[in-house]
Amino acid sequence: MITKRIIPCLDVKEGRVVKGIQFLGLKDAGDPVELAEAYDRESADELVFLDISASHEGRKTMTDVVEQVAAKLAIPFTVGGGINQLSDMKRMLRAGADKVSVNTAAVLRPELITEGADFFGSQCIVAAIDAKYDEDSDCYKVYTHGGRQKTEWEVTAWAKEAVSRGAGEILLTSMDADGEKTGFNHTLTQLVTRAVPVPVIASGGAGSARHMLEAFTIGEADAALAASIFHYKETSIKEVKDYMKKHGVNVR
């Protein structure tokens, strides 16, 4: 039986963890190094760090944070946000990240995925996809620039393209569900998990252990990502894992 992963996500802005709803209304949620250490102790399977500061200063802060976290973390972690070229990937991996996540830059220039996969291997490259239902075209469209810009890409078409170029994993966020805590978008998750042969991390909407269970049993995801429910201690990783075991889902 495949082992499912529980992954806390740290959205980092100006050196602090923040959380919003549908990518808006950001509130402070703590210190990234302290939170990372706590999640490591709680037996999280991995961590995802997303740098949502758009400035050059944000890049430097994030490199510092990654180095500090890497010094204390035993579990794998992925870093994304502002990774626009091979040199950005090198910097984050040198700082201690295990994987890098690419989003906007990869949609604008898909060769970035190929370059990263050729240089570091597919296991290091995560394609992060922000998707939202589009009524006009009756499909899920890919968004870039922190969810501000709609693209022409339909979500499964872009997921397949990213994987064909060497992405070893997909981090799929439902923009409609993000921060709402009403459950993952299983329709979207299942569409993508069935379209690609690589692991898919479901993101956006986790409000309870049951929601995370459903990401596996209904959405068919390989991993479930959550932020605010862990940051604000509404539940713990141990409680979520105990719930999974009770319902027959294999977790570490």
Swiss-Prot record:
<dbReference type="InterPro" id="IPR013785">
    <property type="entry name" value="Aldolase_TIM"/>
</dbReference>
<comment type="similarity">
    <text>Belongs to the HisA/HisF family.</text>
</comment>
<feature type="active site">
    <location>
        <position position="130"/>
    </location>
</feature>
<keyword id="KW-0456">Lyase</keyword>
<dbReference type="GO" id="GO:0000107">
    <property type="term" value="F:imidazoleglycerol-phosphate synthase activity"/>
</dbReference>
<feature type="active site">
    <location>
        <position position="11"/>
    </location>
</feature>
<dbReference type="GO" id="GO:0000105">
    <property type="term" value="P:L-histidine biosynthetic process"/>
</dbReference>
<keyword id="KW-0028">Amino-acid biosynthesis</keyword>
<dbReference type="GO" id="GO:0005737">
    <property type="term" value="C:cytoplasm"/>
</dbReference>
<dbReference type="InterPro" id="IPR050064">
    <property type="entry name" value="IGPS_HisA/HisF"/>
</dbReference>
<comment type="function">
    <text>IGPS catalyzes the conversion of PRFAR and glutamine to IGP, AICAR and glutamate. The HisF subunit catalyzes the cyclization activity that produces IGP and AICAR from PRFAR using the ammonia provided by the HisH subunit.</text>
</comment>
<dbReference type="Pfam" id="PF00977">
    <property type="entry name" value="His_biosynth"/>
</dbReference>
<dbReference type="InterPro" id="IPR004651">
    <property type="entry name" value="HisF"/>
</dbReference>
<protein>
    <recommendedName>
        <fullName>Imidazole glycerol phosphate synthase subunit HisF</fullName>
        <ecNumber>4.3.2.10</ecNumber>
    </recommendedName>
</protein>
<dbReference type="InterPro" id="IPR006062">
    <property type="entry name" value="His_biosynth"/>
</dbReference>
<comment type="subunit">
    <text>Heterodimer of HisH and HisF.</text>
</comment>
<comment type="pathway">
    <text>Amino-acid biosynthesis; L-histidine biosynthesis; L-histidine from 5-phospho-alpha-D-ribose 1-diphosphate: step 5/9.</text>
</comment>
<keyword id="KW-0963">Cytoplasm</keyword>
<dbReference type="GO" id="GO:0016829">
    <property type="term" value="F:lyase activity"/>
</dbReference>
<keyword id="KW-0368">Histidine biosynthesis</keyword>
<dbReference type="InterPro" id="IPR011060">
    <property type="entry name" value="RibuloseP-bd_barrel"/>
</dbReference>
